[in-house]
């Protein structure tokens, strides 16, 4: 069976939740005998790979413009998928889903994964939000099967579009943690084990890293530092202002990191903090939980669905409450809580997606 995937910037080692999702999922599906091709956006990948972990990679030129690239790339990718003779086209995210009807007109079977209502993100203007809402509608109305990554999203599409049939709740997953130390990297950053708070995400407004910096700057940190791991796809006023504020307050910026550097930060941090106002089901949070570290997260529905203890949540946007949570963490002996990660297993998730493919291809 030939599966063609679009809606992601690319794999491997491309920043973003959808990208991490695809990087984990599709090699597992390919390993089970499926012919999988991921269509990548050329401006995000520089490795010149044609195949990775059994997944074929096709790169397409796409203008790197925030408002246009997803739609242009998806249009081109659908045409490539048709030429490749795809049995199933798997489209990720609501922006690319705008073109689900086009794929159906071409006679293709389509699976659509809804990763969250992106129109709620602060970075989009009115026109972009309107297009994203239309994309959500097209995906939910015309895709053969819809995968949702949280119960919040399942209820959303049920209430908005009355889409119940062939809707599948399949959570995001997380890989097994790779515990490690990296003394040379810690010396480079100027941090010590157990003496830093970690924020790990893209530098976009809805992640509210500016709230984390403000909250941290108000507390007696007792020598604990704040480390922000991540960056932005599009350098803009927000990301420039965020980095400037971070440097002003002595926050350590690592840039986009993966592999041993990231694993060492997760292994040894005091706590992970995610203050965001919008999420689908945050893979970064799941990854932090897999390392058995304390977490502090905003009380938005996507984070609440993870089902953590009440004391780790704070009201989104409440700087005072976040400062209090950070102070408590710093003044409490370091702990390593255990979380139930069973439903976030990528191997099980890949089998559930394969079942959808098999039924659709019959």
Give the location of each predicted region:
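Nucleotide-activated donor-binding/catalytic signature segment of Leloir-type glycosyltransferases, i.e.
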Residues: 239-260
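Membrane-proximal helix-turn-helix segments that form the acceptor-binding/catalytic region
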Residues: 79-82, 105, 129-146
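Short hydrophobic beta-strand element within catalytic cores of glycosyltransferases
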Residues: 290, 294-297
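Conserved donor-binding/catalytic core segment of Leloir-type glycosyltransferases
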Residues: 4, 190-217, 227
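Conserved acidic donor-binding segment of nucleotide-sugar-dependent glycosyltransferases
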Residues: 312-319, 327-331
């Amino acid at each position: 069976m030939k599966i063609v995937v679009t809606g992601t910037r690319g794999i491997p080692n491309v920043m973003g939740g959808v990208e991490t999702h695809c990087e984990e999922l599709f090699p597992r599906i390919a390993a089970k005998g499926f012919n999988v091709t991921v269509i990548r956006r050329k401006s995000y990948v520089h490795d010149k790979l044609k195949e990775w972990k059994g997944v074929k990679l096709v790169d397409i030129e796409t203008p790197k413009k925030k408002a246009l690239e997803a739609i242009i790339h998806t249009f081109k990718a659908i045409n490539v998928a048709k030429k490749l003779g795809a049995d199933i086209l798997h489209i990720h995210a609501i922006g690319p889903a705008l073109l689900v009807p086009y794929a159906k007109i071409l006679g293709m079977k389509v699976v659509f994964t809804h990763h969250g209502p992106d129109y709620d993100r602060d970075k989009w203007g009115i026109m972009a939000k309107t297009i994203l809402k239309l994309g959500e509608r097209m995906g939910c109305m015309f895709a053969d099967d819809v995968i949702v990554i949280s119960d919040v999203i399942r209820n959303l599409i049920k209430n908005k579009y009355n889409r119940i049939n062939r809707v599948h709740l399949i959570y995001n997953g997380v890989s097994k943690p790779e515990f490690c130390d990296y003394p040379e990297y810690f010396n480079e950053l100027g941090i010590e084990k157990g003496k830093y708070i970690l924020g790990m995400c893209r530098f976009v407004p809805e992640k509210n890293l500016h709230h984390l910096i403000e909250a941290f700057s108000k507390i007696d940190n007792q020598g604990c530092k704040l480390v922000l791991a991540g960056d932005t796809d599009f350098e803009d006023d927000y990301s420039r202002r965020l980095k400037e504020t971070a440097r002003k307050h002595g926050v350590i910026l690592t840039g986009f990191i993966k592999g041993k550097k990231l694993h060492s930060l997760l292994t040894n941090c005091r706590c992970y903090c995610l203050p965001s106002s919008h999420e689908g089901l945050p893979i970064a949070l799941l990854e932090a939980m897999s390392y058995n570290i304390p977490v502090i997260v905003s009380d938005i529905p996507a984070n609440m669905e993870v089902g953590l203890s009440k004391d780790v949540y704070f009201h989104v946007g409440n700087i005072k409450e976040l400062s209090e949570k950070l102070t408590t963490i710093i003044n409490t002996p370091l702990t390593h809580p255990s979380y139930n990660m069973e439903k976030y297993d990528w191997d099980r998730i890949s089998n559930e997606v394969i079942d959808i493919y098999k039924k659709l291809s019959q």
